[in-house]
Design a protein with these regions (language model features):
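Selective transmembrane helix interface/packing segments
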Residues: 2-594
Length: 594
């Protein structure tokens, strides 16, 4: 019992660390993306000027180290974790696709460098002769589909075992060779350089800004309340971070239990809809019966932080910003809570993990509560106090709102808390409306594409692979919702204060009340409808999964086309000053360095 308690505590600490790192790192990426987007729209230098200079030997080690670690991991899986015969096909498909992916990705990256830098050796000359690196990408896609088609077509034939064995060995070989070749090429290409500058597309710039704020002066106005002035950033920062604790980021991991109650090996396969009760590790920090109430209770304390900052700063602009922030957050939290009442009526629980389980067995919440999703999304953007709802910090009206008298690390905590709030709201929307870790037709024993009683395709998958795919799906859904909130910032102008209040109290609040009424009537009609209605709703749920799957495939194809499409920059001379500068020959610009 003591061992199990210690293990549970260590797992709690590990899961909390993973959730905190996920929220904070995504917030850093959002900061970077926000600045990059602003630089592209305003045609100015973006956050790619922060450079970390490191010795060449260290850079070569950074190139070879991860590659050797990946190779060691692959060798361990191949040599120590021999798959049973029924799992050989799935593992062969996985490694063959990974090997093909790493091969063409390495070729595209090196080919792009050669096109920009020029030819330095015979290998560069061969890559240069291929022309546009996009050709390597298109060839890689063709090989992906060819390997997938051959594997599925010959899996149950007389040559199935040979195909699985060849695919497994070839995939492992391609993966190891491509990773090692790419790392070796990077290490050799920088040999002889005195030092190497790491930019990482500007991702180092937010880190440099964070370090800079630590050493800045911590200014406190002379007549300010020093205790409350220092307390306010912490009251805003930590609640935004800990609300992620109730959001599951993956399905349950199931382990075998020993005779003494200790955890054994991971279960390899699971029945379709079964749930393990013993030896289960939930990918969720805390599983509360009132998880949704916990989220809103802690998220609402951010109002206190904004109000304290405005009151304690001894500044009229800060006070106005604090009052605006408090009124705005209170107004839109009412709408956020009411929009989820309909979802709670449908799911019949306040536990977030059970909401996801309901969606995995029926349909995603966005199909069950479409109006609630859009209302909640709008209210969550307003709750995060970002454009077009950044009334509390409107620069043209009240300088910087309740941020005015803050500097250094305290200002950074306020600033960072806003981006973390974007991540947490996106995670909650993903769990309640987009199925969380659930993906269409992916069950606990594998992939089963069925419409009604018709089975179209099925493929058994290992338990660990299904859990990892689900966790990756949750991360992608959260990132997409964060990206949508980021795009709104650079698309819509700021509302006036009266427009903001009118939207919340006269538009969103009545719509959320109407949604609660409509949901109650529809739920009563379905419950009393009998077996025919239940069968019809089940068929609609299958069609909704098919729609999501097709939309996901279409979105992936569009994203790939967007990435490989040549960029054509077009300036829009909207202002008279821009037109005058263009007529005079343009403005001088140069890459900045830090």
């Amino acid at each position: 019992m003591m061992t199990l308690t210690l293990v549970s505590f260590l797992l709690f600490v590990l899961k909390a660390f993973v959730v905190v790192m996920f929220a904070m790192n995504v917030a850093v990426i959002l900061t970077w993306a926000d600045r990059r987007q602003g630089a592209m729209i305003q045609d100015r230098v973006g956050p790619n000027r922060a450079v970390a200079w490191i010795p060449t030997k260290v850079a070569q080690g950074l190139a070879l180290g991860p590659a050797l670690a990946v190779i060691a991991g692959v060798a361990f899986v191949v040599l120590k974790l021999e798959p049973p015969p029924e799992e050989l096909g799935a593992r062969a498909m996985l490694f063959s696709q990974l090997g093909i992916f790493c091969t063409w990705l390495t070729g595209v990256v090196i080919g792009g460098k050669v096109q920009n830098r020029g030819v330095t050796n015979s290998f560069d000359a061969w890559l240069y002769s291929l022309g546009d690196p996009r050709r390597i990408f298109y060839g890689g896609l063709f090989v992906h589909f060819l390997a997938l088609f051959v594997g599925l077509a010959l899996n149950d034939s007389a040559y199935g075992e040979q195909v699985r064995t060849i695919g497994y060995g070839t995939g492992v070989g391609l993966l190891v060779l491509s990773v090692l070749a790419g790392a070796a090429y990077a290490a050799i290409s920088i040999n002889g350089e005195p030092r190497i500058g790491l930019r990482l597309a500007g991702l180092l710039h937010p880190a440099a800004d964070g370090l800079k704020t630590i050493f800045k002066e911590d200014f406190i106005p002379p007549n300010a309340d020093k205790f409350l002035h220092s307390l306010a950033p912490f009251v805003s920062f930590f609640p935004a971070l800990v609300v992620m604790a109730v959001i599951p980021f993956g399905d349950t991991l199931c382990f075998e239990l020993g005779k003494d109650g200790s955890f054994g090996s991971l279960i390899t396969t699971m029945p379709g809809r079964a749930m393990c009760t013993e030896g289960a590790i939930r990918l969720q920090v805390v599983d509360l019966d009132v998880g949704l109430l916990y989220f809103f209770a802690l998220a609402g304390t951010g109002i206190v932080g904004a109000a304290l900052a405005g009151w304690a700063s001894d500044n009229k602009y800060s006070l106005l910003g604090g009052v605006r922030a408090a009124s705005q957050m209170v107004s839109y939290e009412v709408t956020m809570g009411l929009t989820l009442v309909g979802a709670v009526m449908v799911y019949g629980t306040l536990r977030v993990d059970q909401m996801i389980e309901w969606q995995s067995q029926n349909a995603w919440g966005i199909f069950v509560q479409p109006l609630a999703f859009f209302l909640f999304f709008t209210a969550s953007v307003a709750e995060s106090k970002r454009i077009p709802f950044d009334i509390p910090e409107g620069e043209s009206e009240i300088v910087a709102g309740y941020f005015t008298e803050y500097a250094g690390m305290k200002f950074a905590m306020f600033f960072f808390a806003e981006y973390i709030a974007v991540v947490t709201s996106a995670g909650l929307m993903s769990a309640i409306f987009l199925g969380g870790w659930d993906l269409p037709f992916l069950y606990r024993d594998g992939l089963h594409v069925t419409i009604g009683q018709t089975l179209i395709f099925e493929q058994a998958l290992p338990h660990l692979a299904i859990v990892l795919i689900g966790a990756l799906g949750f991360v992608l859904k959260t990132l997409v919702l964060c990206w949508l909130q980021l795009m709104i910032r650079w698309t819509l102008p700021r509302f006036r204060y009266d427009q903001l209040m009118r939207l919340g109290w006269r538009k969103l609040l009545p719509a959320s009340l109407a949604n609660v009424l409509a949901t109650g009537l529809i739920v009563m009609a379905i419950v009393t409808g009998g077996p025919a209605v239940a069968t019809f709703m089940s068929l609609l749920a299958d069609y909704s999964k098919a729609l999501v799957a097709l939309a996901g495939i279409g979105g992936f194809i569009y994203f790939i086309v967007f990435l490989v499409k040549p960029v054509h920059k077009r300036k829009s001379l909207a202002s008279t000053s821009a037109q005058f500068a263009h007529a005079a020959g343009g403005t001088r610009s140069a890459r900045m360095s830090a």
